[in-house]
């Protein structure tokens, strides 16, 4: 814990095309080596593909995909008397968002399509439909928390 002031949260500037702060944050997650224009091209390209394949608003599909990936509970390791227990804890909203974005990018990169925009679009469409690797990751995390429910009395 810091002894001085806690650093103020910096406000994220919404993205220029859709005016969404959440999408701007996601673009930052996609970005590698500070190449923001490349990341923007990838994300906007993916959203164009999403709009093409599904006849819905791409930003709504993106939001729906993130909602389906966000974990409600996760496990944290806690040492008690020489034994390490996986203790289920609720995930705060900002971390839910961060994990969902991280998993969406991670599992998009592992897909087989040619371009990153196509991979990302595929993962967004799958996640919006409650399928795909990112949603499976969320289910695995929830299953882990459910299996370790007995240790939930070891609070943090």
From Swiss-Prot:
Signal peptide: none annotated. It comes from the Bacteria. One of its GO terms (molecular function) is rRNA binding. GO terms for biological process: translation. SUPFAM superfamilies: Ribosomal protein S7 (SSF47973). Gene3D superfamilies: Ribosomal protein S7 domain. GO terms for cellular component: small ribosomal subunit. Keywords: Ribonucleoprotein, Ribosomal protein, RNA-binding, rRNA-binding, tRNA-binding. The keyword Phosphoprotein does not apply. Belongs to the universal ribosomal protein uS7 family. One of the primary rRNA binding proteins, it binds directly to 16S rRNA where it nucleates assembly of the head domain of the 30S subunit. Is located at the subunit interface close to the decoding center, probably blocks exit of the E-site tRNA. Part of the 30S ribosomal subunit. Contacts proteins S9 and S11. This is Small ribosomal subunit protein uS7. It comes from Marinobacter nauticus (strain ATCC 700491 / DSM 11845 / VT8) (Marinobacter aquaeolei). The gene is rpsG.
